[in-house]
C-alpha cells in the first residue's frame, strides 16, 4: 500500500464536511499505484506533484447526486443523447489525474467528457479548473457555498458563463435553486418541479 499509514481518512458519512488529505512530493507512478490500491470511497487527483484524496461528507453526496437526476430529466425532455461518466478517472500522463463528482458526454461518447461537475465543501476551486484545462474538458460546473458557477473553456482558459453550452436551456442562477433543495428534500419532488420549470 502506498500511503496506508495515513489512511483511512474519516469516511463517516455523518460528517458534514469533506475530509481531505494532501500528499506532497509525489510522482505519476505514486498516483497510479494509489489508484490500483484498494481505497474505496475516495476521490483522487494528481497535479504539480501533489496527490489529493477526498472522502465526501453526506452533504457532499446529497448535492452531487441531485445533478444526475436533473441532467437526466433535461435530456429526456429535450431528447438529447447523453452518456453518464460518473467519477471516471480522467488522465493526461504525467501531468494531471482527476476524478470529478459527476461527468457527461453528449451526442456521442468520448474519452474526455463534455461536462464535469465539482461539488466543493472544503477544497478545490481555481486549481481544479487548471486541472480540467490541461485535460481539455469543454465545460465545468462548480457548486460551492450554495452557489453554482458555469465555466466554458476557450483559447484564454475558462471563462464564466451564465447559460450552459452543453445544456443550453440551463441558467446557473436558476438551476442552483433546484440543486440546493437536494440538501433537505426528496429528489422525486425536486425532479417534478424541475420538469415543470423547463417545459
Report each predicted region and the residues it spans.
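Polyampholytic, low-complexity intrinsically disordered segments
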Residues: 1-45
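Short, surface-exposed charged micro-motifs
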Residues: 41-43, 140, 150
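C-terminal interaction segment
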Residues: 2-18, 68-74, 78-135, 142-199
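Nuclease catalytic cores
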Residues: 48, 56, 60-64
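Short Gly/Ser/Thr- and Asp/Glu-enriched loop/turn motifs at secondary-structure junctions
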Residues: 46-48, 85
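A structure-centric signal for secondary-structure junctions around beta-strands
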Residues: 40-41, 48, 99, 113
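Short hydrophobic-aromatic micro-motifs
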Residues: 51-54, 117
Amino acid at each position: 500500500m502506498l500511503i496506508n499509514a495515513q489512511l483511512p481518512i474519516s469516511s463517516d458519512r455523518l460528517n458534514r464536511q469533506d475530509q481531505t488529505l494532501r500528499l506532497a512530493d509525489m510522482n505519476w507512478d505514486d498516483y497510479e499505484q494509489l489508484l490500483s490500491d484498494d481505497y474505496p470511497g475516495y476521490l483522487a487527483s494528481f497535479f504539480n506533484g501533489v496527490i489529493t484524496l477526498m472522502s465526501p461528507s453526506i452533504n457532499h453526496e446529497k448535492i452531487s447526486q441531485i445533478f444526475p437526476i436533473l441532467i437526466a430529466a433535461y435530456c429526456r425532455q429535450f431528447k438529447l443523447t447523453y452518456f453518464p461518466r460518473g467519477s471516471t478517472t480522467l488522465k493526461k500522463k504525467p501531468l494531471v489525474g482527476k476524478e470529478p463528482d459527476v461527468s457527461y458526454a453528449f451526442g456521442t461518447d468520448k474519452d474526455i467528457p463534455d461536462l464535469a461537475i465539482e461539488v466543493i465543501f472544503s477544497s478545490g476551486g481555481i486549481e481544479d479548473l487548471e486541472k480540467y484545462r490541461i485535460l481539455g474538458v469543454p465545460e465545468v460546473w462548480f457548486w460551492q457555498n450554495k452557489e453554482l458557477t458555469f465555466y466554458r473553456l476557450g483559447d484564454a482558459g475558462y471563462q464564466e458563463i451564465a447559460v450552459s453550452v452543453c445544456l443550453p436551456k440551463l441558467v446557473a442562477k436558476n438551476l442552483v435553486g433546484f440543486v440546493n433543495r437536494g440538501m433537505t428534500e426528496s429528489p422525486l419532488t425536486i425532479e417534478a418541479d424541475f420538469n415543470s420549470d423547463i417545459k
